[in-house]
Structures are given as structure tokens and as C-alpha cells.
Swiss-Prot record:
Family to which this protein belongs: Belongs to the protein kinase superfamily. Ser/Thr protein kinase family.
Disordered as annotated region, ranges: 482-518, 569-638
Compositional bias per record (Basic and acidic residues), positions renumbered to this chain: 582-593
Gene label: ARK1
Annotated compartments: Cytoplasm, Cytoskeleton, Actin patch
Name used for this protein in its record: Actin-regulating kinase 1
Naturally occurring in which organism (per UniProt): Saccharomyces cerevisiae (strain ATCC 204508 / S288c) (Baker's yeast)
SUPFAM superfamilies assigned: Protein kinase-like (PK-like)
Binding, ATP: 28-36, 56
EC identifiers of the protein: 2.7.11.1
Keywords: ATP-binding, Cytoplasm, Cytoskeleton, Kinase, Nucleotide-binding, Phosphoprotein, Serine/threonine-protein kinase, Transferase
Pfam families xref list: Pkinase (PF00069)
Keyword Ion transport belongs to the record: no
Length: 638
């Protein structure tokens, strides 16, 4: 947008601005669309009791710009009675005669005859500002900002800088230029709002004074009073060192938040610490305007000039979601800091978490009270006589009380022995009952003394008689004689041979000790299972009271049976071998069908199929020969 080309008023030009008669005294400066004059007004300003005022003439090209200027005038009207803000006197707007569609606006305001703060600082280049001067300027400018933040809803200046502070005739520093004033800007919710906020920030703020949340709008932080606090920190740094802390780095330096203090001029650590506390990346950790003024007042050794304006107020329509969260957090902090204790108004739980009856906790504590069950995380409030988990009077869990812990430990120690005794008894009963049913179902009346003799005090004779039986058992087990159901008959034959052939002429009465072979019910069919049922008096009786059997006969009988078995197995092997030889001679032996030899398989190379001949019409035709090569002569004369 091009700046309208307008001329300046001559000295003595008279105008009417609202209810005041104005006469131009002097042309002061111009910038942008505005021109500034000093003028005489009638009637005088009641606030400053002066007849000299400042006239600001602005050419507004369109209605949106007119609305922006109207917002500036409205902000000045709200801050009219503050001594550290340039006061508003009167205003007027009319259609401009110079440009089509543009407006001409006149604003009368307080005249600060000592000029701007930037001019005063330029006069002190060699003799820099002292710390008490810096604190005085900072205190007065901050009070002007506090007047804006105290409004409901609060206003944000957004363009606090050295150039926007004027000095009155009474040596008071006043905040001016409210053209960038706005309310709280909530975080943008879509790309359109994001683009609008970014363009608005670029238009209405100064680069070196922008806060991190203004530069990085993707942080999702609101632009509120804390952005003005950041600008005040930059303002204070420039008062001290005549430059901004992020002058060289730009936006990246602001986002990093790292800065240094020059060696000259040298200021107190309190002042440097105040700058550090203001220039914090997170706006929630920056002080508000009251806290900032209080710190400055302590350094000046004067009382704080304002009351705490950051009080908890009822939510209103202008508060956004972030402010409501901050409001609730502030209320919680105030309630926690109050001396009165709040009662627990939480209702009882309507749900119940149950535990299995066979858990370790339930087994170890079978006789616990309902209040003790809560310690095992059952959380049942519906049981009769149960106590809540949290005691309002003592503010501690019942499970941590000493009277509950001691009986708990004793009950654990008392029940350990009972559990061990009960488990041993149950295990013994289960073994006895299982053995009883096993004997009834799968019992073979077989005298165990004939295979495994019982232990006696005189171990010499029993060991000799036992050696042959052990060898027999090892051999028969290795051959799998007790692994299938079909070998029961073999076991019976062994029984008969032991009772008849090895014991001739004797009457044998079997005892109650039996070998029980479990064939069908065993989970592992090839396992030899035996159980021993001992009667009351069998353990103390001798094994061979009425038996007169020679040891040599018993050994001979066992050896003879083993030789017979070996001979029979050799004969069967020879018979099978002869049958195979005969079949081979006749040519009826089975031939392998899969592989003819055990050597490696040789892979034959596949022959590629011959492609069919190409049709003649698809064969490429040679290009026609030139006429010279075809035997014809070219006649050039035609």
C-alpha cells in the first residue's frame, strides 16, 4: 500500500478537533501515515492544566485501518487518568479531500516537551545512565503497563520499546503509541488462524522485542501480558547497555534464550538477576507486572506503588481455555495455602475389585478382618464392618498402622506349621488311595521274594541269592520283556518255572507282597511300574523259612532259559536270511523304485526348444538400392 502524499500544515493554521479549537504552533515529526504538531488548544487540558497539546494527524486509506486507529483511541480513553501514560484529550475523523476513499483523523493528546527517551539516551553516550536512573525509568514505564494489564479484559501493548517512551515537563516517563494494542490472543487452532496471527505480529511488533511465543507460534502458547513482560526485560537491558541482548543472533538467539552481559558499564548483580528472571523462555515462569514492580521497589528501597492486580476473579466471556486452566490452578494454590483444612468429600467407590480365593494372600490370612483385607488390595467398601482405606482424621492408611502389622506377622508364622502338616497328611492319603486303586485294577499275584529278596540282618546269603536275580532283571528290562501287554504270558511262565522247576517237592505259600504291573493306565507305556504293598508283619519275617533250594540249581535254570532264548533268536534270524536268499535267486526281491544308486544325482542339462520359423511377412525387408547401384544411370540433363 502506497503512502498518501500529503502536505504539512503551516504555522498558525486553525482547526477544530472535537470540542477543542486548535492552532498549529510547530511541525515536530512524521512517520508512516502520521504527522505530529505542537498546538494551542482551547479549552486547556484539565488533566495537565496546560493549553499546549500534541496534535497527531493521520491519513487512513481504508476502513480497516480506520478501525485500527479507533482501537488506539479507545485504549487511550481507558488509560486517560494514569500519570505514566500519555493522556488523551480529544479526537475527530472526517473524509479526506486529498485522496479518494481515504479518511483524515486528528487526535489531541498530552504534549511531552522534553521529547523521547531515545533522545535523552543519545545525550548520555559518554556518561551512561546510572542504576538509580534506570530503576526510576523502569518503575514508571512498568506502572503504565500495569494500568493496561489491570483492565478487564486486560490490554497488551505489544510494542514496548525505548522509542515509545516520552518525557514530560515534570520529568516523568510516559508510555505512548497504542497503535498495536490488542487483547489476549489465544493459540491458533487451524492454519488460517496461524497465518493471520503471524502476519499480525510482523505488522504490529518490533523484531528485537518479540517474545519467543510470538516468534514460534507453533508452541501453542497464548500471547498475553507475559509477552509485555518479556518486552520490558529487553527494554531494561537496553537502558543499561544501549543494545538488545539478542541483537546479533536474531530470532534464533531469542528462541535459544542465551545472552550475556557486557563488561561495561558495570551494574549490580540484583539488576542483572532481575533481567535474567524476566527473560525466561517459558512465559509461565516470568513474573507478572506486580511482581516486577515489587522487585524494582525493593531495589529502590521504596514501597510498591500499586496493589496486587493479579487477583483471582470469576471467569468471564473473554477468558480462553488457557486462562481458565491458570485460574483453576491459582484457586487450588490459594486453597492449599489457606489455614483451614478441607474435608474429604469424595464419594465411596461404587465398584469392587475382588481377588481369587486360591491366591497366596487368601491362603496365608484365612481369618483376617474386613479392614485388613484392604491391605491386600481387595478395595471392598461394601463389606460389613469394613473401614475406608483413607482415614480423614489421621490422614494415613490403616495398613500402615502398627497394631495391624504385628498380628499380621504372627498369623503368618502360626499358619506355616499348620500348612506343612496339612500338606504332608494330604499327600500321604493321596498316595495310599492311589496305590490301593492301582492294586485292585492291575494286580498280578507274583511272589516278590523269588525275584527281589527282602533285606535281612545276615546279608551274606541274601546277597548271593540276589546277584543272579539282578542280572536277570537287567537283561529282561533291556530286552523290553515288561514293556508290552503281550509279555504277560512270559511273566506267568517265569512265575511257573520259578515255583515248580526251581522249587521241586516244596509247598509254596505266597505272601501279601506283590508285583503290580500297570500296562494300560500308565501314561508312558514302555515304563515298568511296580508298587510294594507291605503288610504289618512281612518286614520282620525271613524270606525263605520253608524253602530248601540249592543256589546252583537256581542259577542253572536261569542260565538255561537265557541260552534257549538266544538260540531261538539266532534260528529265527537264520531263517529270515535264507528266505531272502531264495527270493533273490528267483528274482522276486523288492527293487528300489526311487533311487538306483547311492551316488550323487547328476542333473542333465535341459535342451532349449527350437523356436518356430518366423513368417515371411514379418521378416525385415532390405531397403531398395540406389539407382546408381541398380545399374541405371542418372540423367542430370532434363
Amino acid at each position: 500500500m502506497n503512502q498518501p502524499q500529503i502536505g504539512t500544515y503551516n504555522v498558525g493554521t486553525q482547526l477544530t478537533v472535537g470540542s477543542h479549537q486548535v492552532e498549529i504552533i510547530k511541525y515536530l515529526t512524521s512517520g508512516g501515515f502520521a504527522q505530529v504538531y505542537s498546538a494551542l488548544i482551547n479549552p486547556p487540558d484539565p488533566h495537565s492544566n496546560s493549553s499546549v497539546a500534541c496534535l497527531k494527524r493521520v491519513i487512513v486509506p481504508d476502513k480497516p485501518s480506520l478501525n485500527t486507529l479507533r482501537a488506539e483511541v479507545d485504549a487511550m480513553r481507558l488509560l486517560k487518568n494514569n500519570r505514566y501514560v500519555v493522556s488523551y484529550i480529544d479526537s475527530h475523523a472526517a473524509k479526506a479531500m486529498l485522496h479518494n476513499g481515504s479518511y483524515e483523523v486528528f487526535v489531541l493528546m498530552e504534549y511531552c516537551e522534553r521529547g523521547g527517551l531515545i533522545d535523552f539516551m543519545n545525550t548520555r553516550l559518554q556518561n551512561r545512565l546510572h542504576e538509580f536512573e534506570i530503576l526510576q525509568i523502569m518503575s514508571q514505564v512498568t506502572q503504565g503497563v500495569a494500568a493496561m494489564h489491570a483492565l478487564q479484559p486486560p490490554l497488551i501493548h505489544r510494542d514496548i520499546k525505548i522509542e515509545n517512551v516520552l518525557i514530560s515537563a515534570n520529568n516523568e516517563y510516559k508510555l505512548c503509541d497504542f497503535g498495536s494494542v490488542c487483547g489476549i490472543i489465544r493459540p491458533p487452532r487451524n492454519s488460517q488462524e496461524l497465518s493471520y496471527v503471524q502476519q499480525d505480529i510482523l505488522k504490529n511488533t518490533t523484531a528485537q522485542y518479540r517474545s519467543p511465543e510470538m516468534i514460534d507460534t507453533f508452541r501453542g502458547l497464548p500471547i498475553d501480558e507475559k509477552s509485555d513482560i518479556w518486552a520490558l526485560g529487553i527494554f531494561l537491558y537496553k537502558l543499561c547497555y544501549y543494545t538488545t541482548p539478542f541483537e546479533k543472533g536474531g530470532d534464533l538467539a531469542i528462541l535459544s534464550g542465551k545472552f550475556e552481559f557486557p563488561l561495561y558499564p558495570n551494574y549490580s548483580e540484583q539488576l542483572k538477576g532481575l533481567i535474567r528472571d524476566i527473560l525466561v523462555q517459558d512465559p509461565r515462569h516470568r513474573p507478572n507486572v506486580y511482581q516486577l514492580l515489587k522487585r524494582i521497589s525493593i531495589m529502590q528501597n521504596v514501597p510498591c506503588p500499586i496493589n496486587d492486580i493479579q487477583v483471582v476473579q470469576a471467569p468471564s466471556s473473554h477468558l480462553n481455555l488457557t486462562e481458565l486452566h491458570q485460574l483453576s490452578a491459582t484457586q487450588n494454590i490459594l486453597s492449599l495455602n489457606s489455614p483451614t483444612t478441607m474435608e474429604n468429600t469424595m464419594p465411596n467407590a461404587t465398584f469392587q475389585i475382588s481377588m481369587a480365593d486360591n491366591t497366596t494372600t487368601a491362603q496365608m490370612h484365612p481369618n483376617r478382618k474386613p479392614s485388613q483385607i484392604a491391605y491386600d488390595a481387595s478395595f471392598s467398601n461394601s463389606a460389613k464392618g469394613s473401614q475406608p482405606l483413607f482415614d480423614k482424621s489421621q490422614n494415613m492408611y490403616h495398613a500402615l498402622d502398627p497394631p495391624l502389622v504385628e498380628p499380621l506377622a504372627s498369623s503368618v508364622s502360626n499358619n506355616d506349621n499348620e500348612l506343612k502338616a496339612n500338606s504332608a497328611t494330604k499327600l500321604k492319603q493321596a498316595i495310599v488311595s492311589e496305590a490301593h486303586t492301582f492294586r485292585q485294577n492291575n494286580s498280578i499275584d507274583f511272589p516278590l521274594q523269588n525275584i527281589i529278596p527282602q533285606y535281612e540282618d545276615s546279608s551274606s546269603s541274601s546277597d548271593e541269592s540276589y546277584s543272579g536275580d539282578v542280572d536277570e532283571l537287567k537283561k529282561t528290562r533291556s530286552l523290553g520283556s515288561y514293556s508290552t501287554r503281550g509279555n504277560i504270558k512270559k511273566n506267568q511262565s517265569v512265575k511257573e518255572s520259578l515255583t515248580s522247576s526251581s522249587l521241586p517237592g516244596t509247598s509254596f505259600t505266597p505272601t501279601s507282597t506283590k508285583v503290580n504291573l500297570k500296562h494300560e493306565n500308565s501314561p508312558f507305556k514302555s515304563t515298568f511300574v511296580n508298587t510294594i504293598d507291605n503288610s504289618k508283619d512281612d518286614l520282620n519275617k525271613p524270606s525263605y523259612e520253608d524253602l530248601d533250594v540249592s543256589k546252583q540249581n537256581l542259577k542253572n535254570s536261569i542260565q538255561q532259559r537265557m541260552i534257549d532264548k538266544l538260540n531261538s533268536s539266532e534260528e529265527s534270524f537264520n531263517a529270515r536270511k535264507m528266505s531272502k536268499v531264495k527270493l533273490h535267486e528267483k528274482g522276486e526281491i523288492d527293487k528300489p523304485t526311487m533311487l538306483k544308486s547311492s551316488g550323487p544325482i547328476s542333473k542333465d542339462k535341459k535342451t532349449k526348444p527350437t523356436p518356430p520359423p518366423k513368417p515371411s511377412h514379418l521378416k525385415p525387408k532390405p531397403p531398395p538400392k540406389p539407382l546408381l547401384l541398380a545399374g541405371r544411370k542418372l540423367s542430370l540433363d532434363k
